[in-house]
């Protein structure tokens, strides 16, 4: 099983507002950058999209260390998801889970991989986190300025 290192980030100019996501995948000394955006989104949706797109890009089962500065994503997938599924996609308070379609997509994308979800403090000098932050912000800016390519 291949070992892959993944770094993800999402960005939103306003919340909601133009959004961008980015991922950096590293395997065996090679790197691949992924990035995209949406004209209107939220920061949480973009954080989820970064992880989803990174995992959906992989064509075979892998051992992954996925770094995210989003506690929402890390806690959602590692702690909250089992309860949401048990309660038919309701929170502990009985409200519908926000971004359910993205959580379901992320859950599906995780099934064939072994993933170690690691939280990294954002904007704290981690070079890979800073790199995906710039890529995601550039995508959000491109969405805002009408020059998006994705």
Swiss-Prot record:
One family name in Pfam for this protein: RNase_H
UniProt main location, coarse: cytoplasm
Key words of the record: Cytoplasm, Endonuclease, Hydrolase, Magnesium, Metal-binding, Nuclease
PANTHER family, per database record: RIBONUCLEASE H1 (PTHR10642:SF26)
GO molecular function, one term: magnesium ion binding
EC number assigned by the record: 3.1.26.4
InterPro entries: RNase_H (IPR050092), RNaseH-like_sf (IPR012337), RNaseH_domain (IPR002156), RNaseH_sf (IPR036397), RNaseHI (IPR022892)
Binding site for Mg(2+) 1: 9, 47, 69
Protein function: Endonuclease that specifically degrades the RNA of RNA-DNA hybrids.
Enzyme's top EC category: hydrolase
Subcellular location: Cytoplasm
Catalytic activity: Endonucleolytic cleavage to 5'-phosphomonoester
Gene Ontology cellular-component annotations: cytoplasm
Entry note: cofactor: Binds 1 Mg(2+) ion per subunit. May bind a second metal ion at a regulatory site, or after substrate binding.
Binding site for Mg(2+) 2: 9, 133
Superkingdom in the source lineage: Bacteria
Name of the featured protein: Ribonuclease H
Species annotation: Xanthomonas oryzae pv. oryzae (strain KACC10331 / KXO85)
Subunit structure: Monomer.
PROSITE patterns on file: RNASE_H_1 (PS50879)
Single GO BP term: DNA replication, removal of RNA primer
Family: Belongs to the RNase H family.
Cofactor(s) the protein requires to work: Mg(2+)
Ranges for domain RNase H type-1: 1-141
Lineage: Bacteria, Pseudomonadati, Pseudomonadota, Gammaproteobacteria, Lysobacterales
